[in-house]
UniProtKB/Swiss-Prot annotation:
Domain of life: Eukaryota
Biased composition (Low complexity): 846-860
Gene this chain is encoded by: Nin
Residue ranges of the region described as Sufficient for interaction with ens: 487-526
Consequence of gene disruption: Viable and fertile. However, one report found that hatching rate is severely decreased in mutants, likely resulting from most embryos exhibiting varying severities of mitotic defects, such as excessive nuclear fallout, abnormal nuclear aggregates, bridges between chromosomes, chromosome segregation defects, delocalization of the centrosome from the mitotic spindle, and in some cases failure of cellularization, monopolar and tripolar spindles. Moderate reduction in survival to adulthood and a small decrease in larval motility.
Function of the molecule: Required for the positioning and anchorage of the microtubule minus-ends in various cells. In fat body cells, part of perinuclear non-centrosomal microtubule-organizing centers (ncMTOCs) which function to accommodate the organization of microtubule (MT) networks to control nuclear positioning and dynein motor-based retrograde endosomal trafficking. Within the ncMTOCs, Msp300 and shot anchors the ncMTOC at the nuclear surface and recruits the MT minus-end regulators Patronin and Nin for assembly, anchoring and/or stabilization of circumferential and radial MTs at the ncMTOC.
Name of the protein in its database record: Ninein homolog
């Protein structure tokens, strides 16, 4: 920072530098230290208060200097405008013998009599003067310090010589203290004179005093009084001729000769010549009188003695006239001072009245403010009590609803347990039948083996001779063997189907057990949530706590059903050529039994399928209830909270990594700078040695000036303006997006109002109608809360990829995972939180979720990511132009990452809106990339300069080695070329030193600027994240209130239907009674007319 040549400002800057902690900035502690060093009043509390509100990051030297000047100016104004200081000036030609005369106790004009003050008055006087404004007496004089200084200068100009002693005595006014001692002057000789300041100084004092700050009424009165006093004394004072002390002590020769001629003294010039005053133009009166007295003593003649006496008398007459003039002037000045003093007393009285009125108004205002604050406090207390009561009612209603939900859940649990027991009994019956069938099959197999063995033995006994082996029995045996093989294959297939059926039954049992476990867990979790909510209600009724727990959506068991199938062994019997008809009949009967068992198994399978369909229908029916909807909303909320926490953790880790990298680079840079400084100091020492050795002759070469730094500064300013404009555009787009979201929320409310009829008729729907409604709801855009939130683009998460990367230095990629729960091809763009990110070391990877066109097009470039995040959304299809633009942006990001050693993140891939929203971050990234390149170029230049400096050091070492030879050579002859070379080297060294200092300063400023921008952007990110969290909380609250309204409407509708049914029943009863009465009337009317 440039500091002026003022030594006081330089000293202040040195003190500022000694106290600073940051780079040119002061925090609160360093400000207190600097104020204590400057010895300010109250340690500069007012100065720190003026600086603390507007500068949160720190205070620079310029800001501190301006604030200090304002503080000192206010202090000086307060001191000068506090009141007039009454002083009296006594100016004498010689030192005076002053005596103090005790004045009697008198009633002062400005004295306020002490009274008993009732109440507490904080400001100014405690009572008002009893006398009137125009009944005040006149004091000596009321002068300020400036008037006294001017009077001293005028007195010095009046005296005109330094030999005379000037005495200026200041005393308080006579009316300030009762019984004060007045300063009197005792004149020992007639030549001593007491005078006051000249009239022009008094006029200036009047003009200064009347310019003081007063109220409008007092100012008008003061102006009238000053005009009257000036009109009274201007004529008498201005008519006088001012007489100086020189005129009193000296007189001209011409005036002496005229006075003597009027006194009829002959030969005046000869007389002056005799007295010794012939050649002088002005004569001292005392010396002339002394000379005349000496002449009178020495003269004997009467005539000459009379002439001398007449001359002496004429001199005394002129001196007496001068004294009269001086006395008249003093008298007029005294009158003028008394009038001024009287006017000043009147002004003081007016000011006292104004001060009392002002302080009375201040007290009234303070009382009114206190009353307003008390009223506001009472209203605030009322509002808080009302809120407390409302919150208590709300939470009591919530607890009642939760208890009803618990009762319904317990009933569902009982129903499911009964169904589970029935299924278990059926399963045990099926297992017993299956075991019986298996035993029968094994027995048949054993009988078949025995029969085969017997057939083989009979065939061997019969076919022992080849002569009795006809062809027909062989063919018949071959056919039998083929049929046997087919039967065996069928048996094996039946055994496999039996094993599969067992596996399915085992899986069904496991699923039933898992459902039971899930019910138990949900019940325990509901109880825990009730306990937590009760504790939260006790702690704070109006604040919502942040829950960090596993969402209910993750309570599903992910256990795979174990393979519970049993390995079956199939024994193949030996084939035989012969068979028996009885055995074949037994086998046919067994086949019929197995077929019947297969039919039973198929019927059981159908039964299981029907049960599964009923379970699905029951689940879908339960999902349509508002309780399940609220549960889904709670799960989505917890997922969003978890995603937000993951995002915060991710960015914190990123920031910590960036800070560590920045600190490492700064340490490396400081080490290099330290080494370069050491080398530079050594070089400077050697250059000084050479300067001492050789003389400095020759002219300096011109320094090369370059305008690169100015151009770079102008470019940086232009880029900063662009960044500001882009940030303004982005804020406008965010405001538009918020308005669109609000309109969509209103649409959702309307849809919820239309869906009341569907919810009221849900109790009368069958399983098929429930399935159809669920399918239609799956197709609709607002079928589930998660799909609706996806449509509103409120759910978003920069999920971390779970794939292990080879390079641990680069962080895991940020994913935009696809697949919303309601529909896969949702056509809406989401604004991810990573769009506002600035520094990121993760490359961008696109996720492949479903058959979306963006992912299918980029399947070759990017690998498929692992499983989707708990909350995900598919991307929209985009035009080829937009896709090309997004690919170009990704390529730019990749090139910038390879050049600067860091990769910047870019999520602007999907549509024009997201591209416009990401314009400011991309501009920031380009600017940071360019600054990084510029920093690298500066480092290269510094390295080049350090190499040049090392070369110069080597040259200087060589010159030192050649020093004795050069000394001998210079002793013989002179070498101007070496001298010029040395001068050039010195100039070059100085130029290099200046360049290095400039570059160091510029790099430091760049680093500070980038760090400040980084901090500002981090704060902006935090604020945006907080606003988004608040918006999400508001939306969830609105959705919960909408769900509660739907529930209330459903309950009311059910009550209304019940009342309608009851009324219809009553109407039917009334109609029946009416019909019966009519019939009775008809019967009663027919009896008397009978024959």
């Amino acid at each position: 920072m440039e500091v002026s040549a003022d030594p006081y400002e330089q000293k202040l800057y040195q003190m500022f530098r000694s106290c600073e902690t940051q780079c040119g900035l002061l925090d609160e502690k360093s400000l207190l230290k600097l104020c204590s060093l400057l010895e300010l009043r109250d340690q500069g509390s007012a100065l720190i208060a003026s600086l603390g509100g507007s500068h949160q990051l720190g205070v620079s030297f310029g800001q501190f200097k301006e604030a200090l000047l304002n503080f000192l100016g206010s202090e000086f104004d307060g001191n000068t405008s506090s009141g007039f200081i009454e002083r009296s000036l006594v100016i004498t030609d010689e030192p005076l013998n002053n005596t103090y005369i005790e004045s009697p106790p008198e009633s002062s004009d400005r004295e306020v009599s002490p009274k008993l003050v009732v109440g507490t008055k904080k400001y100014g006087r405690r009572s008002r003067p009893q006398q009137g404004i125009y009944e005040l007496s006149v004091t000596d004089s009321d002068n300020t310090d400036e008037d006294q200084l001017q009077q001293q200068q005028n007195q010095r100009s009046l005296n005109g010589c330094d030999e005379l002693g000037v005495q200026v005595q200041r005393s308080s006014s006579q009316s300030d203290l009762p019984g004060s001692r007045r300063l009197r002057s005792v004149h020992t000789s007639g030549s001593k004179l007491k005078r006051c300041a000249s009239l022009p100084a008094r006029r200036k004092m009047n003009s200064n005093t009347t310019g003081a700050t007063t109220s409008p009424t007092a100012a008008a009165k003061l102006k009238q009084l000053s005009i009257q006093s000036q009109a009274q004394h201007s004529s008498s004072v201005e008519s006088l001729d001012t007489v100086t002390p020189q005129q009193l002590e000296t007189i001209s020769v011409h005036s002496i000769m005229e006075a003597w001629e009027l006194a009829s003294i002959p030969n005046t010039r000869n007389l002056l010549h005799v007295l010794g005053f012939d050649e002088e133009e002005e004569v001292n009166l005392q010396q002339l009188t002394k000379a005349l007295e000496e002449e009178l003593r020495g003269i004997d003649g009467d005539h000459e003695q009379s002439n001398m006496l007449r001359a002496l008398a004429a001199l005394q007459a002129t001196e007496l006239g001068n004294y009269r003039l001086a006395y008249r002037q003093q008298h007029e000045e005294n009158l003028k001072l008394r009038a001024d003093n009287k006017a000043a007393n009147q002004r003081v009285a007016l000011l006292a009245v104004e001060v009392d009125e002002r302080h009375a108004s201040l007290e009234d205002n303070s009382k009114k403010q206190v009353q307003q604050l008390e009223q506001r406090h009472a209203s605030m207390v009322r509002e808080i009590t009302l809120r407390m009561t409302n919150d208590r009612d709300h939470w009591t209603s919530m607890t009642g609803k939760l208890e009803a939900q618990l009762k319904s859940l317990e009933q569902e649990e009982i129903r499911l347990r009964t169904e589970l027991e029935l299924v278990r009994t059926e399963n045990t019956e099926l297992e017993s039948e299956q075991q019986k069938a298996h035993i029968q099959i094994t027995e048949l197999l054993e009988q078949n083996i025995k029969l085969n063995q017997e057939l083989a033995q009979t065939s061997s006994s019969i076919g022992g001779t080849p002569e009795h082996s006809p062809l027909r029995p062989r063919r018949h045996s071959e056919d039998k063997e083929e049929e046997m093989l087919q039967l065996m294959e069928k048996l094996a297939a039946l055994q496999m189907e039996n094993a599969q059926l067992r596996d399915k039954t085992d899986e069904l049992t496991i699923e039933i057990e898992s459902l039971n476990v899930e019910l138990i867990r949900s019940k325990t979790k509901a109880k825990k949530q009730e306990k937590q909510e009760k504790q939260e209600d006790q702690e704070s009724a109006a604040t919502a706590t942040k829950r960090r727990g596993d969402s209910p959506s993750k309570t599903h068991l992910t256990e795979e059903s174990p393979r519970l199938g049993k390995q079956r062994k199939c024994t193949e019997g030996e084939q035989s050529d012969a068979s028996n008809s009885g055995d074949w009949l037994a086998l046919n009967s067994e086949l019929q039994r197995s077929q019947s068992q297969d039919e039973e198994l198929t019927s059981l399978r159908q039964r299981v399928a029907e049960l599964e369909e009923e379970l699905k229908a029951a689940k879908e029916g339960r999902s349509l209830t508002p309780e399940s909807r609220s549960k889904e909303l709670e799960t989505s909320l917890e997922q969003m909270q978890r995603a937000y926490e993951d995002c915060e953790d991710y960015w914190q880790t990123k920031l910590s990594e960036e800070r560590q990298l920045f600190e490492k680079e700064r340490q490396i840079y400081e080490d290099e700078q330290h080494e370069s400084d050491k080398k530079f100091t050594e070089l400077m020492e050697k250059v000084r040695e050479y300067e001492e050795q050789f003389s400095k002759d020759g002219r300096l070469s011109p320094i090369d000036e370059r305008d690169m730094l100015e151009q770079q500064y102008s470019e940086l300013e232009a880029e900063a303006a662009q960044l500001r404009s882009s940030s303004i555009q982005m804020l406008e787009e965010k405001a538009q997006e918020i308005s669109s979201l609000q309109s969509e929320i209103e649409d959702l409310r309307q849809r919820l109002g239309e869906s009341v009829e569907i919810l009221t008729g849900a109790c009368e729907l069958t399983s098929e109608s429930v399935a159809q409604l669920s399918a239609e709801a799956g197709k609709s855009p607002a079928s589930s809360p998660i799909s609706y939130l996806w449509l509103q683009s409120t759910i978003q998460e920069p999920a971390k990829s779970l794939a292990d990367s080879k390079d641990e230095a680069t962080a895991s990629a940020i994913e935009l995972l696809g697949g919303s729960p309601s529909h896969k091809t949702a056509s809406r763009n989401n604004l991810t939180t990573s769009e506002t990110s600035i520094f990121s070391t993760t490359p961008f990877e696109s996720s492949q979720s479903g058959p979306s066109p963006t992912n299918s097009g980029n399947s070759n470039a990017y690998g498929a990511n692992p499983g989707p995040a708990p909350i995900s959304k598919p991307k929209r299809s985009q035009s080829p132009q937009q896709a090309a633009a997004s690919e170009g942006e990704i390529a730019d990001c990749e090139t910038s990452s390879t050049a600067s050693g860091k990769s910047f993140e870019s999520n602007s891939k999907t549509s024009c809106l997201s591209h416009e929203k990401c314009s400011s971050p991309s501009a920031l990234k380009e600017e940071l990339k360019r600054l990084k390149f510029f920093e690298l170029s500066l480092k290269e230049q510094i390295k080049d300069l350090s190499l040049q400096r090392d070369g110069l050091v080597m040259e200087l070492q060589q010159l030192q080695e050649a020093r004795p030879v050069l000394e001998k050579a210079y002793a013989r002859t002179t070498h101007p070329t070496l001298q010029q070379r040395l001068n050039q080297l010195e100039l070059r060294n100085r130029h290099l030193q200046n360049v290095i200092k400039q570059q160091q300063h510029y790099t430091e400023s760049l680093m500070q600027q980038s760090w400040r921008q980084h901090q500002v952007e981090l704060n902006d990110l935090h604020s945006r994240i907080e606003t988004q969290g608040v918006l999400l909380a508001d939306q969830t609250q609105r959705l919960q209130s909408a769900d509660i309204l739907v529930k209330d409407l459903y309950v009311e509708n059910s009550h209304l239907t019940a009342t309608v049914q009851r009324l219809e029943q009553q109407r039917a009863r009334v109609n029946l009674i009416h019909q019966q009465q009519q019939q009775q009337r008809l019967v009663g009317g027919g009896l008397p007319g009978m024959p």
